[in-house]
């Protein structure tokens, strides 16, 4: 039996002389001649028939006969499984190396930004602690310098200047004290002598004094030998030690330190 379909599944036209009489076909196909086969262009097959999924019927297209496909006219399409269909639909183009480099650069930039922000926070915390300790040190220094505890708060520069002047004044005071001590130990300076009646009580009558002198032990000479001036100085020094320097002649340290 001769097949009436071509390779594309489109019905093949018969000869004009076999299909219909000349007079009936001449009106339908005026250009057809006797003995000539008239072929139509193949019917376009939609792209969906070649996709991974099942073929979808197209409106207006003739349906394919399964017997003709078995006969060898068209190869039968192998039904695809769901996994293959999913793999086909999920197949994507792999990312380019430029995109990979950009993504790595973005990730590295984010990590660097987070690490730099943490470093800045730690540096700011250290700076705040340093400033706090410096302020506490200046506050303690103001309590030791003259006029540091006044109502007027001294600035840092004024506090340092007052501390330097106070240290220099203390050094001068120590130098003067050392010089006076060295002069006294070398005998260059002697304390002023004063009459004995200033420090001692009035003595008894001359008779009682001579009686007391003669009543001493016989091995001593009594009062015939005059007393040495050194012993008199030592007794005077021991009895009048608190009145050697009057209070008016003492150095006024409070007025001297008040200028600083």
UniProtKB/Swiss-Prot annotation:
Keywords carried by this UniProt record: Cytoplasm, Developmental protein, Differentiation, DNA-binding, Neurogenesis, Nucleus
Entry keyword Metal-binding: no
Gene Ontology annotations of biological process type: cell differentiation; chorionic trophoblast cell development; in utero embryonic development; negative regulation of Schwann cell proliferation; negative regulation of T-helper 1 cell differentiation; negative regulation of T-helper 17 cell differentiation; negative regulation of T-helper 2 cell differentiation; negative regulation of transcription by RNA polymerase II
Tissue specificity as recorded in UniProt: Expressed in Schwann cells in the peripheral nerve (at protein level). Also expressed by endothelial cells (at protein level). May be expressed in neuronal precursor cells.
Biased composition (Low complexity): 110-121, 200-218
Function description: Transcription factor. Binds to E-box motifs 5'-CANNTG-3' in the regulatory elements of target genes, probably as a heterodimer with another basic helix-loop-helix (bHLH) protein such as the transcription factor TCF3. May bind both open and closed chromatin, acting as a pioneer transcription factor to allow other factors to bind and activate lineage-specific genes. Required during post-implantation development for the generation of some differentiated trophoblast cell types.
Protein name: Achaete-scute homolog 2
Gene behind the chain: Ascl2
């Amino acid at each position: 039996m001769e097949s009436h379909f071509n390779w594309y599944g489109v019905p093949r036209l018969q000869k004009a002389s076999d299909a219909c009489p000349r007079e009936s076909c001449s009106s339908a196909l005026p250009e057809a001649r006797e003995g000539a086969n008239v072929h139509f262009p193949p019917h376009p097959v939609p792209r969906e028939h070649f996709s991974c999924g099942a073929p979808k019927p197209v409106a207006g297209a003739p349906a394919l006969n399964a017997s003709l496909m078995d006969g060898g006219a068209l190869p039968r399409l192998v039904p695809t499984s769901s996994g293959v269909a999913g793999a086909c639909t999920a197949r994507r183009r792999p990312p380019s190396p430029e995109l990979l480099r950009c993504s790595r650069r973005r990730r590295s930039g984010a990590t660097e930004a987070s690490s730099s922000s943490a470093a800045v926070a730690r540096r700011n915390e250290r700076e705040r602690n340093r400033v706090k300790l410096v302020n506490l040190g200046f506050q303690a220094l103001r309590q030791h310098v003259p006029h540091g505890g006044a109502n007027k708060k001294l600035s840092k520069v004024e506090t340092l200047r007052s501390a330097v002047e106070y240290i220099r004044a203390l050094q001068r005071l120590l130098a003067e004290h050392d010089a006076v001590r060295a002069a006294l130990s070398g005998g260059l300076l002697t304390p002023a002598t004063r009459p004995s009646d200033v420090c001692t009580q009035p003595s008894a009558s001359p008779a009682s004094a001579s009686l007391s002198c003669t009543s001493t032990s016989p091995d001593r000479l009594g009062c015939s030998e005059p007393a040495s001036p050194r012993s008199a100085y030592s007794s005077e020094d021991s009895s009048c030690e608190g009145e050697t320097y009057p209070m008016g002649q003492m150095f006024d340290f409070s007025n001297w330190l008040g200028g600083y």
